[in-house]
């Protein structure tokens, strides 16, 4: 017998920007992504602090917590000190329905 995976996409037309850090913000974004929202995680160039907690295989790998909290997300890095970064953030925020920051 075959089972079809049930997917709840109640938030399929919602765009979320995730500037969250560590557990609370990223977890919120993951839950919204689970419900079908388009979630975009914005990180600094070197990566968020939570990216390297408990690496899977080696010191340079991404941690299991990071992978779990960032499922169903698109990602981008941004250098806030570079000219033009504020314009990019402004455009992203104008296109978003939800902004996560903690």
Language-model region placement:
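N-terminal helix-loop segment corresponding to the beta1-alpha1 unit
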Residues: 2-102
């Amino acid at each position: 017998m075959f089972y079809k995976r049930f997917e709840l996409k109640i938030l399929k037309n919602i765009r979320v920007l995730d500037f969250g850090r560590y557990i609370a913000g990223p977890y919120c974004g993951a839950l919204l992504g689970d419900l079908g929202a388009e979630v975009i995680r914005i990180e600094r160039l070197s990566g968020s602090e939570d990216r390297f907690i408990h690496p899977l295989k080696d010191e340079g790998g991404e941690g299991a917590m990071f992978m779990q909290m960032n499922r169903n997300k698109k990602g981008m890095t941004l250098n806030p000190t570079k000219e033009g970064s504020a314009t990019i953030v402004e455009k992203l925020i104008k296109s978003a329905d939800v902004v996560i920051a903690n």
